[in-house]
Amino acid sequence: MDTRIIDHPAFALIGHAVRVPLIHEGENPHIREFIESLPTTEHERLKTLSDTTPAGLLQVTDGVDPDYREGTDLTYLHGVAVSAAASAPADLAIVDVPAGMWAVFTAHGSYPKALQDTWAATAGEWFPSNPWRLRPGPSIVSILDRAEDFTTATTELWLPVERD
């Protein structure tokens, strides 16, 4: 599993947020509809606000059920990362993220399957065999590269962690 641990300073996630049900496999139609409802110009505006890592447009989940039960509601934020000192436009939701350690997992392949398989492998393989555990905070997906039709992609899954 392609993984690295990063010590990241405090930052904020800003963007457009919605409550959606958690779906474990396949595309989440609620998230797809939400993203499609945003004008293309809004995606471009968000990109111009990003000034820290993780870079680019991000898929953020927050407020997830601790047991990750399918069908439970979570907050999905379509946005970008900005430095803690940056000011966000008033029309955007903000998730403040404290400084801390992150496990960053890279996935390549069929989208969203390769990403979902990586999620599952973190719980079933990586966490049980490493001295880290999840800490409170959002989960972040960064799309590093993708096919034009989005059937394949290279992604990074950022999970907040602390030493076990």
Task: Give the positions of each predicted feature.
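A solvent-exposed interaction/effector surface
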Residues: M1-D164
